Amino acid sequence: MTTNLQEMGKQAKQAAFVLAQLSQQQKNQALEIIAQQLEAQSDKILAENQKDIALAKQNGLSDAIIDRLLLTPSRLNDIANDVHHVISLADPVGQLIDGGILDSGLKIERVRVPLGVIGTIYEARPNVTIDVASLCLKTGNAVILRGGKETQYSNKILVDVVQHALVQAGLPKYAIQAITDPDRHLVMELLKLDRYVDMIIPRGGASLHELCKQHSTIPVIVGGIGVCHLFIEQSADLDKALPLIENAKTQRPSTCNTLETLLVQRAIATQFLPKLAQHLSAKHVKFHADPTALAILQSVQADVEPVQAHQLRQEWLSYDLNVVIVDDIEQAIAHIREYGSQHSDGILTGSQRLAQQFVAQVDSAAVYVNASTRFTDGGQFGLGAEVAVSTQKLHARGPMGLEALTTYKWVCVGDYCVRS
């Protein structure tokens, strides 16, 4: 373990002790300064981001990755607004969860407290730097950030802005730190830093999550892989379904809550798929279809090719869409269980009974009825900027907002009580 990373961990732990004692007013003041500095330093931030974009293009990175990497004035404004929204949220730290008084007279309360130090490993998403920093600060947690090399210029300027704001607010600079060295071995070292780090949150592709699961000695939040499905059932309103599917697939295809596989009930396939192909033609969606859907889509000259088995488990993060024909809801649910990632899956239907069946039997973090999967987001759910979307079941599930960055302690107060 390098001395540098050990020192970062030690500094983060010391900062976490300070943050845990702060009032909501003190934390909100620091967050307000961060939001102000994001706006004041926007030109510098965007200029540094363009360096990352230029390198990404030079290195031949995909359009999906470049879209994730890109900051625009609008996106930077959205990030600052997310910080303001976090300010407006109630501080969960110190909340009384439950409690009572024992026969012995001992008063017991379960109180919400910060986790301590969070380690976040992420790829080409500079917005994560501010999302994580603001949520951790609001909940009294310190954080060590390790962004991908693709975001080195963006992350450095963003962390500089945050640390400057912390100092202005009279808080420890080391509450928010970033590993700027692109050496991949430092990721492995961070995963072993259990003396100081209390939780690891990876945000990236399947390989990153698998790496963290296999090598971390620190609890890991698993999630973010979005092989999301929509099942359109024969009683659905087909005209209303078209713009919904367009939204789920094309609004921002590089996100983890984007639709990747459309399941179409056989009874409406011949009627619906030509309409879908026409509706999505302007968006240049490329279909990957099973034999039945392939024949229908080819008959209307859609951009389509046969779907390969491995593509049914693929997070496209692009304008590609799998189309699979199923006989009924049972086949749709079976397909989702086999190929889904337990992220976000939905049904389009006019049947309350089938909607209830789908909700009960699909085991995903977010299950939708007649709505786009694009809603799986901390801001959309009213949680503020999210730190991640968890697809596991322990500790947190779905978009992780403020409460997901806390744990609890038992506070026991007596009058010199002894156990009999």
UniProtKB/Swiss-Prot annotation:
One of its GO terms (cellular component) is cytoplasm. It is found in: Cytoplasm. GO terms for biological process: L-proline biosynthetic process. It catalyses: L-glutamate 5-semialdehyde + phosphate + NADP(+) = L-glutamyl 5-phosphate + NADPH + H(+). The keyword Cell membrane does not apply. PROSITE patterns: PROA. The gene is proA. SUPFAM superfamilies: ALDH-like. It comes from the Bacteria. Catalyzes the NADPH-dependent reduction of L-glutamate 5-phosphate into L-glutamate 5-semialdehyde and phosphate. The product spontaneously undergoes cyclization to form 1-pyrroline-5-carboxylate. Pathway: Amino-acid biosynthesis; L-proline biosynthesis; L-glutamate 5-semialdehyde from L-glutamate: step 2/2. Coiled coil: none annotated. It is an enzyme of class 1 (oxidoreductase). This is Gamma-glutamyl phosphate reductase. Its EC number is 1.2.1.41. The keyword NADP applies. It holds the Pfam family Aldedh. InterPro entries: Ald_DH/histidinol_DH, Ald_DH_C, Ald_DH_N, Aldehyde_DH_dom, G-glutamylP_reductase_CS, Glu-5-SA_DH, GPR_dom. Belongs to the gamma-glutamyl phosphate reductase family. Keywords: Amino-acid biosynthesis, Cytoplasm, NADP, Oxidoreductase, Proline biosynthesis. GO terms for molecular function: glutamate-5-semialdehyde dehydrogenase activity; NADP binding. It comes from Pasteurella multocida (strain Pm70).
